[in-house]
Amino acid sequence: MQTAHIGTDIIEISRIRKAIKAHSQRILNKIFTKREQEYCLSLTNPYPSFAARFAAKEAVAKALGTGIGKVVRWKDIEILKSSKHPEVYLPERVYKELGISKVLLSISHSREYATAVAVTLI
C-alpha cells in the first residue's frame, strides 16, 4: 500500500508581480528554471503563471516534507504545462533519497491568488 503526503500553498499574485518588478532577472533565475521562465514570459500577463508555479513549488516541497532548503532547492522543482495537467520534474536523487514514486499536482489561479495542491506517493 502506498503512502501519500499532501502539501498546499496559496499566494497573492501581486506579491510575485512586485518581487519580479523589483528584482527582475535575479529573482526569476533564483526561483524558476529556464523552461518555466520561457513559458510564463510567452504569455501576455506572465504574473499569474509565475505565481502559480511559485505556489506549486512550495506545495511540492511541503508534500516532500523537506521545504525549500538543503535537500530541495527552488530550481530542483520544475513545473511544466502538459496537455492534461501540470507536470512536476525533480532530480532523480530526490526520488531516491526520499523514496518518492510519483508527484501529483493541481494548480489554479484567480484574479488575485494562485494556489496549488501537491501529493507525493511513497
Swiss-Prot record:
Task of the protein: Transfers the 4'-phosphopantetheine moiety from coenzyme A to a Ser of acyl-carrier-protein.
Positions that bind Mg(2+): 9, 58
UniProt GO molecular function: holo-[acyl-carrier-protein] synthase activity; magnesium ion binding
Gene Ontology cellular-component annotations: cytoplasm
Compartment annotation: Cytoplasm
HAMAP family: AcpS (MF_00101)
Source organism per UniProt: Chlamydia caviae (strain ATCC VR-813 / DSM 19441 / 03DC25 / GPIC)
One Pfam family from the record: ACPS
Catalytic reaction list: apo-[ACP] + CoA = holo-[ACP] + adenosine 3',5'-bisphosphate + H(+)
Family: Belongs to the P-Pant transferase superfamily. AcpS family.
Keyword Lipid biosynthesis: yes
EC number(s) stated in the UniProt entry for this protein: 2.7.8.7
Protein name: Holo-[acyl-carrier-protein] synthase
BP terms from Gene Ontology: fatty acid biosynthetic process
Keyword terms, alphabetized: Cytoplasm, Fatty acid biosynthesis, Fatty acid metabolism, Lipid biosynthesis, Lipid metabolism, Magnesium, Metal-binding, Transferase
Cofactor(s) the protein needs: Mg(2+)
